[in-house]
Amino acid sequence: MMEKEGKKPERHMDNILKMSIPVKSMSEVSRPGSAALGNTDAMRASLRNSRRSFSGHVRLVLRLVYGFISAVIIAGSPLRDRVCFQITGKGQAKQSDVWVIPAMPVYVSPFQEACFVFSPSAMVT
């Protein structure tokens, strides 16, 4: 009994080599952010959507900056009097000041509001 306690257990290499361990490939392993689909397509789609979202934000900021710069240019111009048309979804325009007929287009804001600068001599009542 004492002899068995002092001995090292025998290793059976045959049993270890024959034992099969299921190995999952990296594409089958679920990752955070992959919508639990467990494939690389979900990761690619997530990256694509984040790129779209970022580019959408960049476009929005650029439109706001463009609109602000255009508004500053018009506010500083000598022809500050202008008539604005609100463009509706059907392509028709509502005129906010109906007594002005001749106008030259100068500015289109990013908020679908087309502004026209006109000279006071061109006003028709």
Curated annotation (Swiss-Prot):
Disruption phenotype: Causes resistance to toxic polyamine concentrations. Present in the 5'-UTR of plasma membrane ATPase 1 (PMA1), the ORF spans two upstream activating sequences (UAS) that are important for the expression of PMA1, and the deletion phenoytpe is attributed to down-regulation of PMA1. It comes from the Eukaryota. This is Uncharacterized protein BRP1. It comes from Saccharomyces cerevisiae (strain ATCC 204508 / S288c) (Baker's yeast). The gene is BRP1.
